Amino acid sequence: SSRTNPLIVDGGIESIERNLNDLGIDALIAIGGEDTLGVASVLSDHGISVIGVPKTIDNDLSGTDYTFGFDTAVTIATEAIDRLHTTAESHHRVLICEVMGRHAGWIALHSGMAGGANGILIPEVPFELNEVMGWVESRFRSHYSPILVVSEGALPKDGELITKDATLDSFGHVKLSGIGEWLAGQIEQRTGKEARTTVLGHVQRGGTPTAFDRVLATRFGLNAIRAVKDKDWGKMVALQGTDIVRVPLATATGVLKTVPLARYVEASAFFG
């Protein structure tokens, strides 16, 4: 994925317009997440013929129920959690699985529920450390070893994001890293139980796509071409229910689609 933001490059938009004209390109199909489609929306505002396709493992684009890549990432994370259960039980320790999710906790929520996690921490709901310790101790009292799934963007109440360093990419994002290790240290200090962290990182972004993602991407592609033929510029193809529809790029990127509190409360029935 490119981390270059043409909107902050001098003459970036003009350069894009010139290159498209020089190459005889009639339409641009932008495939990506909030940054890619955010740029696509601005390009559309400047009169460039653009159609968007939602591709991000974070599933955080508005206007679509699912983005392709999300189901594959959840499957990879779930398989990892399944494996972590074995070593957690054999060594009687706390296992923390840190997954991607800067602003939205969809991967943690879905993989945590599917993998039978005993606690899930997401960016949308700042957590109380004492509550997390309660989940851990409750699990050990039942003679089981706890598994916690944590989004990289999760943070404690009255706390700050755990970052790798202070540098920003061209879209203004900090490099997140370390919430899992930090939490493991807190658990060991407060409960005396051994805690280990597995950071899945970029393994979530590759590999063989699931059947769901293959079908979804195929349907998105077909409908993106139809939108081009219709000259329905400035739109993103989206999945709503079982239908592929078109929504304005500005709508898709205006507000991030985050995990509703009700979904997190639903999952919390299995915590501890």
Role assignments for model-derived ranges:
Residues 1-30, 35, 68-80, 272:
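Glycine-rich oxoanion-binding loops at beta->alpha junctions
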Residues 27-32, 40-42, 70-91, 95-194:
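Accessory alpha-helical/coil subdomains and C-terminal extensions
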Residues 46-83:
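Glycine/threonine-rich beta-strand-loop-alpha-helix active-site module
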Residues 160-163, 207-215, 247-254:
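Short glycine/threonine-rich loop-to-helix capping motif typified by GTGT followed
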Residues 182, 235-272:
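Phosphate-binding loop/pocket of nucleotide- and phosphate-handling active sites
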